[in-house]
């Protein structure tokens, strides 16, 4: 796969014939402003000959990226890579999960697994959205979710039974099952755990994670100065 910045994954440059030239891993990250020469990464799909499989030691954990592939290259073995330009996303963080979900809903990432056509949102049976609220940006609402008036859910995942209050704004976030978000609260780039109770007029942004069953009193958390 090709990605904008391979430093988070390690790069795998190939020659014109597709032959792998190196496996470059960045356990110590490169200095800032020094991008890698190759933006190709190892996406973790391999085809091995039986002889290679039989050469992998048994009885311990083996990293094929750190042990097997470097050994093959050092021995002069012919290792080839296929560059795939399909949609790909590393789902290793909550933010990536939310983005991946939105990409599926909107059709950016093609799939046959959606319960309906691609569009701006998926609203599962039993969920209720007030007429003056908006669910957009590839959002998903689980079963029995309640979205009160004047609320906006944009590019987010709201799990079953959550209650979204009047005037709430949820952007690029995940809201857990049966969580409650009080009126006027802003949730952006955040994760709200199952059964969490977030009081009115809070501001939860910038990667905040609220643990399950936590109660946040009204007006307790702010990320911006009051006007």
Where are these regions (language model features)?
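Short beta-strand-to-loop element that shapes/binds the nucleotide-sugar donor at the catalytic cleft/hinge
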Residues: 1-14
């Amino acid at each position: 796969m090709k990605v904008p910045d391979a430093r988070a994954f390690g790069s795998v440059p190939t020659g014109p014939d597709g032959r792998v030239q190196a496996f470059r891993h960045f356990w110590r990250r490169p200095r800032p402003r020094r991008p890698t020469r190759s933006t190709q990464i190892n996406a973790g799909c391999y085809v091995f000959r039986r002889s290679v499989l039989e050469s992998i030691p048994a009885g311990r954990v083996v990293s094929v990226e750190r042990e097997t592939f470097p050994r093959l290259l050092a021995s002069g073995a012919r290792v080839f890579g296929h560059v795939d330009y399909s949609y790909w996303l590393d789902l290793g963080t909550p933010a990536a999960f939310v983005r991946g979900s939105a990409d599926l809903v909107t059709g950016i990432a093609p799939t046959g697994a959606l319960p309906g056509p691609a569009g701006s949102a998926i609203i599962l049976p039993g969920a209720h959205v007030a007429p003056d609220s908006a669910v957009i940006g590839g959002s998903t609402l689980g079963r029995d979710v309640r979205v009160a008036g004047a609320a906006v859910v944009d590019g987010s995942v709201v799990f079953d039974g959550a209650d979204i209050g009047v005037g709430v704004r949820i952007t690029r976030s995940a809201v857990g099952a049966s969580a409650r978000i009080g009126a006027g609260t802003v949730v952006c780039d955040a994760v709200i755990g199952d059964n969490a109770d977030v009081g009115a007029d809070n501001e939860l942004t910038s990667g905040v994670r609220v643990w399950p069953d936590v109660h946040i009193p009204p007006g307790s958390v702010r990320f911006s100065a009051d006007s």
